[in-house]
Amino acid sequence: MNFCPLGNHKHFSMQDDIKPKKKLLLATIENIDQEGRGVTHINGKAIFVEGALQGELVECESYVKKPSYEIAFTERVIRQSNLRVKPKCEHFNRCGGCSMQHFEFQAQIAAKQRVFENTLSRIGKVKTETILTPLAGPSWHYRYKGRLRVKFVVKKNKALVGFNEKRTHFIADISSCEVLPQTLSDILPQLQDLITQLSIKDKIPQIEFAADQNHLVLVLRILDVLNTNDELLLNTFSSQHPVQFWTQSKGPDTIKPLSPRDDVKLSYALKEFGLRFSFMPYDFTQINPFINQVLVRRAMSLLKPSKDDRIFDF
């Protein structure tokens, strides 16, 4: 029933102040999919549950609903798996940069192997004879190539640099990252402050990064021209921190160092084979250089090349 308070002609409803309760699903997680989500079935319908582990009993809320499946996120863990660990990153529950920090590392590898074997068998119809031991590298600060979103938020008077928040298109406000190169993670707050000071702070949508063991290159995607003071700020920053700035104004052919001192040579080495490969910040390289070295070593041990053989990596 509507009513009109004295002195106010606006109509109100008794239900205006009552927020609808969340519709939570109670689910027992049956297994893990290729994206690290828990999988369950309710009334025959597949539900993919973010943040849930096999064997757990959780309350979850669906946010994507399709005729044949739903995607949900974990609201509360009622019965916890012994493989659940505390995420190392303080931003994990909000930032969408990674999704499995709650899952013990060796258990992650085992789960991924099961998914891989199941895919070979169920989809590829391949019967495996021998399964090699999975390869693994460092679990933290391994991502040496990638892209960060940038957004200047007027209300905060602050430039955000990072990944999208989980389940939104907004950029997560983070001060560090456990998967980025350590040098980049360490300077994230200062980098955000630097972007905030630029005259074109609202004209920089993204930053691509490329790193090796000795250098970190940040390629600023700029939609307007940097003025003299902007260049001074960037040059001063790179002289005080282990970073070199490059810019990209249009297509890939416009990528260039901000100044001659930023024109560094990136490289990665395969020391046991006496090889060192140089690459540019915009070249394709493996995101994880550590696992790449292990892969090459494994491939060479399986190939058993003679001294006259030549091996090509395509």
PLM region spans:
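Accessory RNA-recognition modules of RNA-modification enzymes
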Residues: 4-314
